[in-house]
Amino acid sequence: MTSASTKVGEIFSAAGAAFTKLGELTMQLHPVSDSSPAGAKWTETEIEMLRAAVKRFGDDLNHISCVIKERTVAQIKTTVKRKVYEDSGIPLPAESPKKGPKKMTSGVLSPPNAPPPSSSSVPEAGVPPIKKQKADVTLSALNDSDANSDLVDVEGLGETPPAKKLNFDQA
């Protein structure tokens, strides 16, 4: 067995022992016959301790489930973002967040830093700059979970529009 499967086996063995003990305690709590010893009667404090332990166990499992779900969703989003960047020919941003998703009250992440402009996008001297159509992919657009929202078309993001030539010879 691998190390991970050994650890999982140990977890299930411990869980089995815990559930066996819970079953024993439950049987003590609700004796089958009236002939049970007088010491088997539980006090309210003991019952509350058992209830609290079982509740903590359930809460801990729910917390672990949420952590795993958030990590899985973050991994899927990261994979999709990387694929979008690769397919569009845009280099990945230099800073890749390793801290996990940023939580904000508005539910929208800040847009990534735009990659530095390449030398081919700088206009030549004497030619007025051309207003470039904005086609940046933002994190909020990628993180939008609404299936019916407008999709970002990443085809042609790397292409530069043809430069308009000015004719100064007309008089």
UniProtKB/Swiss-Prot annotation:
Query: Cellular component per GO?
Result: MLL1 complex; NURF complex
Note down the stretches annotated as region Disordered.
86-171
Question: Carries keyword Phosphoprotein?
Answer: yes
* Phosphoserine carried by residues: S96
What molecular functions are annotated in GO for this chain? Answer: DNA binding
Specify where it is mainly localized. nucleus
Spell out the Low complexity composition-biased ranges. Answer: 119-129
Task: Give the organism, scientific name.
Answer: Mus musculus (Mouse)
Family matches, as InterPro entries:
Homeodomain-like_sf, SANT/Myb
Instruction: Name the gene.
Output: Bacc1
Family matches, as SUPFAM superfamilies: Homeodomain-like
Q: Name one GO biological process term.
A: chromatin organization
Where in or outside the cell it occurs: the entry states: Nucleus
Assembly, in brief, is:
Component of some MLL1/MLL complex, at least composed of the core components KMT2A/MLL1, ASH2L, HCFC1/HCF1, WDR5 and RBBP5, as well as the facultative components BACC1, CHD8, E2F6, HSP70, INO80C, KANSL1, LAS1L, MAX, MCRS1, MGA, MYST1/MOF, PELP1, PHF20, PRP31, RING2, RUVB1/TIP49A, RUVB2/TIP49B, SENP3, TAF1, TAF4, TAF6, TAF7, TAF9 and TEX10. Component of the nucleosome-remodeling factor (NURF) complex.
Primary role = Component of chromatin complexes such as the MLL1/MLL and NURF complexes.
UniProt entry keywords in alphabetical sequence? Chromatin regulator, DNA-binding, Nucleus, Phosphoprotein
Q: Where is the SANT domain?
A: 38-83
Record's protein name: BPTF-associated chromatin complex component 1
